Amino acid sequence: MNSTNQSLKPLTTKINEAGNLEIGGCDLIGLAEKYGTPLYVLDEETIRKICKDYKNAFKAYPKTNMMYASKALCTMATSAIMSSEGFGFDVVSAGEIYTVYKAGADMSKVLFNGNNKSADELTLAIELGVGRISVDNFFELALLNEIAKSHKKVVDVLLRITPGIECHTHEYIQ
């Protein structure tokens, strides 16, 4: 899939009447003066356009789920935008679970990933209705089963299977 935006700059980038660079109607000099630098400025129009491009690229495959990797940038604003575009979320912590929840995400479209998940994180995931939990080892599976039973919930899981090949990674996913 080729991006429709072949430029590095956001779609709404322009030079305004003051001669300053502007993105999404915001004068970047003014933002820098108000918030300091470095400063990350995202363009909602560009983000939404990219989301639509991805959805269009995969529309021939209706069972495809678009997932935003929250570890890239997990804020209320980005989560709300991605959710409103119909994306699910790949989250790796309680903070990310809570952020996408507060942003109004459809929690059934959330996948809780990551190794060494704590009992508190698994409990939060179950209580907030996370759609699937990726399980990395037998200990985590037993812990999740215990927590799910105590909440009288059935949890959809994805099992990470390792074929016994040494890859020198985190001990919890060996």
Predicted regions and their residues:
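A charged N-terminal "starter" segment
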Residues: 1-156
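Active-site loop/helix belt of alpha/beta enzymes
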Residues: 1-3, 147, 163-174
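Short glycine- and Lys/Arg-enriched binding-loop motifs that mark or flank ligand-binding interfaces
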Residues: 110, 160, 172
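Glycine-rich, aromatic-flanked loop segments that form ligand/cofactor-binding clefts
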Residues: 152-166
